[in-house]
Structure formats: structure tokens, C-alpha cells
């Protein structure tokens, strides 16, 4: 410690010395008077101090209470009660009084012993090193986390699982078809094994850089999107060791209480859809529990003035918002309109009608709104309940809304007539205003923008060929044949978009403008990111027609993916399908394992594997069983009754 410096003499007040000869007698008399005065002052101060000290002494009863407070609380002292017959006489006396005093003494001894034990434990803690204390704290934290996991993973009330048909099988009799199916399985194994090695736990994989990849739709957290998305594909293909690896990761690591902003739409179709499908296929309770946990985290997104959910929600805070690029802060039709299948199953499995009410509210609101030319615009403001920009598309921003109207009807065992009517009305408007034929005879689905038709079709819109075929049965005015043919025409157009490229892989979108047909013009539209929609349409049309061309076209696509997208670390998209020397984008999308490879595998499987009269595939290709109940009331669900 530094010694403080002495104050300089010039800074002190020192009275000057009088060095002249004193007048001695006068000086003594003055001193005597001063001494008496000082003594009197001291005496007065002493008396005042004593009196004040006596006056301000603490109340002895309060001091006693403070000193014995613990004993007063823990040891009931025996006093004469106010209501006693003889005041001043103890109520407890004789042997009872003696026994009470013994108990009181034992209690005092116990308090002293506990106090000494606590002191010893405190001393022991102080003697431990900082590392030991940290280790103990971490152990306690781990214990609390484990207890929370046990509580979170508590089984939900049992609900009868629908009759599940065709979760195994599909072995083709033809050797050539069997070999092709095995090749698709090997491609799945290559994609999964490399993700397992280089991207495990991350949402997706960068197969060239050989590291994890997390797009912003899943937020900043490692939620294992590829694991959840691929589970049912692994199960269907009989890759059970890989399935168990994924299941263990989900049990130990999948946590939704993270400070991460995610897309409500994407986590619904990929995570909730994937977990529900894995539950129905395997019967493992953990998948149902995790699906419900995530669904609860999505519910705050519906806290808007209209009940139309936000596009994004923070899983921890529940704060929602919409995409900055969306028209006037709007929600997207294909996003808030693609929740029905998963939410109906959540209500079925939990008995909680909240999920059912959320999606039915969206449906009722849409039914009341005016629709220009009978078409649903892609943008709806969740604050005002008004349409945004008048842009209608069966491709991106609109696609799966129409798909889920049809599939809501199918999933209800064709009893949700309201959904079927909405689908039929929408398809009639689409056919009237959006579906056109090119000069070369190709049927395409354009986009309606601000009163005019843009003659451009996106890869995402190619799913519609399968949708038209799937919805043919039950269509109005006995038009089943018409819609099956319309689906086939869309499939042919999308196949042409593949066949007119150098890689035999389709671009992201393609135009029909003059001499240009089914070809991408802009560089940003020439990429292929392992999308499934064309192969999805091939599979549906194969199931309904058994026309061999769909297997042939599917195999062409599989060979092109194998040749141009396969790399040592997995599969990657390509940036230009018109270049014979493509550049890879270095992303293995989770939907490649969930959809593209699953549809290829089913294309070369028998119809008894996941038959369409028992299963409905969500927009991420996760199969959910048909519920044989009226989904407008869920009256057939014992959990609800």
C-alpha cells in the first residue's frame, strides 16, 4: 500500500507565536477564567452524552426478540393464555410440562447441530478450488436440465392410431425396376452418410466444403433439419440403423427453447410433418412429443389482429414478423395456407382443439373475402385483413395452398366437403385465367400480375400435374378424365423443360414467349437446386395410369442427378443447367432427402407401399394417414369426446 503524503505546512492553519514579553499576572488570571469555562463545557457535554445514551438505549424486549428470534419461531414457548382460568398459571404442567421441556431441549440441540453442519459445509466449500466449485455447479445444472427433459418428454394421452396400411413392402417383381430402386436407395445412403460425417446436427450440408449449412429459414440454431426431414425416407427404404441414429439425436439434442427466429411454414412442413410421419411409421412416442412441443412454440405467430399468422416467429420470445420483401408487410398465401394437414393431426393426437381452430379460422376468413376473378392473391395483410399486391401463382407463394385444400378433403376420408368446394372453385378459376397452351402445344400455368398474364412457369408449379391427377376422382361434372389429362399435359411440359437443357435437369423457371418455349432466359433462373416437383408429378401419374413413360422420365432425372449433382461429399445443386460444365452451389438441401429421393424410390416401388387411399403426403412428402372422421368437428376422436 502506498503511504499517503503528509500535508504541506503551508496548508495548515497554525496560529502565529507571540514572542514578546508577557504580562504575567494578567496572563494567569486570563488562563484561570478560561480553564473554568472549558471545564464547565466538558462537564455539560458529559452529562448530555450520558443522558442521551440512556435515552437511546434499545428496548430490551426487542433486543431479546432479535436475539432469540429463531427459537421463537421454531420452539413454541409456554405462556399463560389470555383465556386461561387462572392467569399466571401455565397451561402445561406436571409430566406434560417436563416432557415439553425435553422436546424443547432436543429441538434446540437439533438446531445447533444443523447450524454447525451448515458451517462445516460452508467451510468445506471455501476449501475447494474454483474448478471443483464450477464442476459442482455444472453437475447441478445438468441435473435440472435432465429433470426438465423428463418432464417435457412425458407421454401424451393415448389416442387410437388410425389403421396403418402399407408401411412396408413395395418390392417390384421386375429385376430392372428392382435394380433402379436399389440405386435410388444407394443415392440416399450416400447423401445421408456424408451429412452424418460432415454436417451432423446442422440443418443442411455443404458437400464440397464438407461442413454444415444453415439457411435463414431455420434461424441461427442447429436444429438438425436434414435429420428430421429424412427420417421417414430412411424408414421406408429400410435403412433402420440410420433411422435409429436420427432418432437418438432427436431424443438427446432437438430443443425448441432456443432464441432463434424460424419460418413458421418451413418448420411446420419439415419438422412437424417429418416428426408426425416418423411417429406414425415407427410408433415411437418421442416423435409425437417433439412435434407437439414445436407446435406450441409456433402458436404465438397467430397473435395478430386477424388470426393470420406471421411468417416468422422467435421460438423463445414468441415475437413474430413478416418477410421484409413481402407486399405491404403481408403474410404469404402458400405459407399460412399450408398448415391444415399437420394441425388437424396435432388436434387428433392431443385432443387439443387449439390447432384445429387456428386453421379453420384461416379458412373461414378466406371464404369471406372477395377474390379477383375467383383467384386468391398471394399476399394478405395480417393486420388489416386485406389483400396486398394482386399477384396470383400456382408456383412459388401460392402453390401448396391449393394442394392443401385438396388434401384436407382426402385426409378426412373425403368428408370435408367445404375444403373440396374451395379446391374445385379455385381450380376452375385457375384453368380459366392461368392455364394456357403455347404455340408449340405445351400446356403451362402462368402467373397473374396486376391484371395481365405473365407467360412464365416455375419449377415449383410443376407439382400441379400430380395435384390435378390426385384430385381427378371426385371432381365436378364427372370431369375426372379431363383433370387426369390436364395433369399429364403439365407433366409433359415440365419434362420438356428438363429435356431442353444440357444437363437434362430443369431450370428454376422457364418462359413461353414467342419462339422461346420451356426455356429459362435469365441467368438467375437457370439453376437446379435438387428440387422434387417434376419427379413428384411423375410418381402420381404413374400411380394413376401406370404409363411406363413416367418411370422412364424419372430414371432420366435420376441419372442426371447422379452424373451432375453427385460429389464426394454428397449431392449439390448446379447453377446453370444449360452449361455442360456446371458449377455447383455447394448445398445439399434437406428436401432432397425428404422429397426428391423418396418420390424416386416410390416411383420404382409397388403400389402397395403407402397406398394413396390410406395415406396423404404433405407438401414436404411426409406421409400422414387418412383420418376416418369428419375433420370439421373432430367428433370421431375419442380424445376429444
Curated annotation (Swiss-Prot):
UniProt membrane topology term: Single-pass type II membrane protein
Superkingdom to which the source organism belongs: Eukaryota
Residues bearing glycans: 631
Reactions the enzyme catalyzes: N(4)-(alpha-D-Man-(1->2)-alpha-D-Man-(1->2)-alpha-D-Man-(1->3)-[alpha-D-Man-(1->2)-alpha-D-Man-(1->3)-[alpha-D-Man-(1->2)-alpha-D-Man-(1->6)]-alpha-D-Man-(1->6)]-beta-D-Man-(1->4)-beta-D-GlcNAc-(1->4)-beta-D-GlcNAc)-L-asparaginyl-[protein] (N-glucan mannose isomer 9A1,2,3B1,2,3) + 4 H2O = N(4)-(alpha-D-Man-(1->3)-[alpha-D-Man-(1->3)-[alpha-D-Man-(1->6)]-alpha-D-Man-(1->6)]-beta-D-Man-(1->4)-beta-D-GlcNAc-(1->4)-beta-D-GlcNAc)-L-asparaginyl-[protein] (N-glucan mannose isomer 5A1,2) + 4 beta-D-mannose; N(4)-(alpha-D-Man-(1->2)-alpha-D-Man-(1->2)-alpha-D-Man-(1->3)-[alpha-D-Man-(1->3)-[alpha-D-Man-(1->2)-alpha-D-Man-(1->6)]-alpha-D-Man-(1->6)]-beta-D-Man-(1->4)-beta-D-GlcNAc-(1->4)-beta-D-GlcNAc)-L-asparaginyl-[protein] (N-glucan mannose isomer 8A1,2,3B1,3) + 3 H2O = N(4)-(alpha-D-Man-(1->3)-[alpha-D-Man-(1->3)-[alpha-D-Man-(1->6)]-alpha-D-Man-(1->6)]-beta-D-Man-(1->4)-beta-D-GlcNAc-(1->4)-beta-D-GlcNAc)-L-asparaginyl-[protein] (N-glucan mannose isomer 5A1,2) + 3 beta-D-mannose
Pathway assigned in UniProt: Protein modification; protein glycosylation
Keywords for the protein's UniProt record, in alphabetical order: Acetylation, Calcium, Disulfide bond, Glycoprotein, Glycosidase, Golgi apparatus, Hydrolase, Membrane, Metal-binding, Signal-anchor, Transmembrane, Transmembrane helix
Cofactor(s) required, per the database record: Ca(2+)
Family, similarity comment: Belongs to the glycosyl hydrolase 47 family.
Biological role: Involved in the maturation of Asn-linked oligosaccharides. Progressively trim alpha-1,2-linked mannose residues from Man(9)GlcNAc(2) to produce Man(5)GlcNAc(2).
Protein's UniProt name: Mannosyl-oligosaccharide 1,2-alpha-mannosidase IB
The species this protein was found in: Homo sapiens
Gene assigned in the entry: MAN1A2
Amino acid at each position: 500500500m502506498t503511504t499517503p503524503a503528509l500535508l504541506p505546512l503551508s496548508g495548515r492553519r497554525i496560529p502565529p507565536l507571540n514572542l514578546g514579553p508577557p504580562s504575567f499576572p494578567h496572563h494567569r488570571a486570563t488562563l484561570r477564567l478560561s480553564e473554568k469555562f472549558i471545564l464547565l463545557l466538558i462537564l455539560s457535554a458529559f452529562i448530555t452524552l450520558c443522558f442521551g445514551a440512556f435515552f437511546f438505549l434499545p428496548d430490551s424486549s426487542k433486543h431479546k426478540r432479535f436475539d432469540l428470534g429463531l427459537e421463537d419461531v421454531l420452539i413454541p414457548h409456554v405462556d399463560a393464555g389470555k383465556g386461561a382460568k387462572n392467569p399466571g398459571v401455565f397451561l402445561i404442567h406436571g409430566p406434560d410440562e417436563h416432557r415439553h421441556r425435553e422436546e424443547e431441549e432436543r429441538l434446540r440441540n437439533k438446531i445447533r447441530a444443523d447450524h454447525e453442519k451448515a458451517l462445516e459445509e460452508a467451510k468445506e466449500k471455501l476449501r475447494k478450488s474454483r474448478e471443483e466449485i464450477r464442476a459442482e455447479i455444472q453437475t447441478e445444472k445438468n441435473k435440472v436440465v435432465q429433470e426438465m427433459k423428463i418432464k417435457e418428454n412425458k407421454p401424451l394421452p393415448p389416442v387410437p392410431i388410425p389403421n396403418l396400411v402399407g408401411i412396408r413392402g413395395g418390392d417390384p417383381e421386375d429385376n430392372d425396376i428392382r435394380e433402379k430402386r436399389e440405386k435410388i436407395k444407394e443415392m440416399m445412403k450416400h447423401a445421408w452418410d456424408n451429412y452424418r460425417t460432415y454436417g451432423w446436427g446442422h440443418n443442411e450440408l455443404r458437400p464440397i466444403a464438407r461442413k454444415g449449412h444453415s439457411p435463414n429459414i431455420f434461424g441461427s440454431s442447429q436444429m438438425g433439419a436434414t435429420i428430421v426431414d429424412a427420417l421417414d425416407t430412411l424408414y421406408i427404404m429400410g435403412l433402420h440403423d440410420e433411422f435409429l441414429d436420427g432418432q437418438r439425436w432427436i431424443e438427446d439434442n432437438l430443443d425448441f427453447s432456443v432464441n432463434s427466429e424460424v419460418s413458421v411454414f418451413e418448420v411446420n412442413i419439415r419438422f412437424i410433418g417429418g416428426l408426425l410421419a416418423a411417429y406414425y411409421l415407427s410408433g415411437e412416442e418421442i416423435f409425437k412429443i417433439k412435434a407437439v412441443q414445436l407446435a406450441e412454440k409456433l402458436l404465438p405467430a397467430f397473435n395478430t389482429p386477424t388470426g393470420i399468422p406471421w411468417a416468422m416467429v422467435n421460438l423463445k420470445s414468441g415475437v413474430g414478423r413478416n418477410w421484409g420483401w413481402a407486399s405491404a408487410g403481408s403474410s404469404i398465401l402458400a405459407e399460412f395456407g399450408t398448415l391444415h394437414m399437420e394441425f388437424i393431426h396435432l388436434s387428433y393426437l392431443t385432443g387439443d382443439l387449439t390447432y384445429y381452430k387456428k386453421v379453420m379460422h384461416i379458412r373461414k376468413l378466406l371464404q369471406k373475402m372477395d377474390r379477383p376473378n375467383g383467384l386468391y392473391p398471394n399476399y394478405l395483410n395480417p393486420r388489416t385483413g386485406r389483400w396486398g399486391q394482386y399477384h396470383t401463382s400456382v408456383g412459388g407463394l401460392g402453390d401448396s395452398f391449393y394442394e392443401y385444400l385438396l388434401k384436407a378433403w382426402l385426409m378426412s376420408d373425403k368428408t370435408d366437403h367445404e375444403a373440396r368446394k374451395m379446391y374445385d372453385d379455385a381450380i376452375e378459376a385457375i384453368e380459366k385465367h392461368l392455364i394456357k397452351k403455347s404455340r408449340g402445344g405445351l400446356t403451362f400455368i402462368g402467373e397473374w400480375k396486376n391484371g395481365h398474364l405473365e407467360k412464365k412457369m416455375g419449377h415449383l408449379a410443376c407439382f400441379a400435374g400430380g395435384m390435378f391427377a390426385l384430385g381427378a376422382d371426385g371432381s365436378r361434372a364427372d370431369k375426372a378424365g379431363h383433370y387426369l389429362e390436364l395433369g399429364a399435359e403439365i407433366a409433359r411440359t415440365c419434362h420438356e423443360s428438363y429435356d431442353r437443357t444440357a444437363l437434362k435437369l430443369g431450370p428454376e423457371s422457364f418462359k413461353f414467349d414467342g419462339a422461346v418455349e420451356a426455356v429459362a432466359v435469365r441467368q438467375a433462373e437457370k439453376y437446379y437446386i435438387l428440387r422434387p416437383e417434376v419427379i413428384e408429378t411423375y410418381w402420381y401419374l404413374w400411380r394413376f395410369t401406370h404409363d411406363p413413360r413416367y418411370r422412364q422420365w424419372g430414371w432420366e432425372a435420376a441419372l442426371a442427378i447422379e452424373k451432375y449433382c453427385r460429389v464426394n461429399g454428397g449431392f449439390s445443386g448446379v447453377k446453370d443447367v444449360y452449361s455442360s460444365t456446371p458449377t455447383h452451389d455447394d448445398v445439399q438441401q434437406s428436401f432432397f432427402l425428404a422429397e426428391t429421393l423418396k418420390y424416386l424410390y416410390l416411383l420404382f416401388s409397388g403400389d402397395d407401399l403407402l397406398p394413396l387411399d390410406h395415406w396423404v403426403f404433405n407438401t414436404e412428402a411426409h406421409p400422414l394417414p387418412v383420418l376416418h372422421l369428419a375433420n370439421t368437428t373432430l367428433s370421431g376422436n375419442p380424445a376429444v369426446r
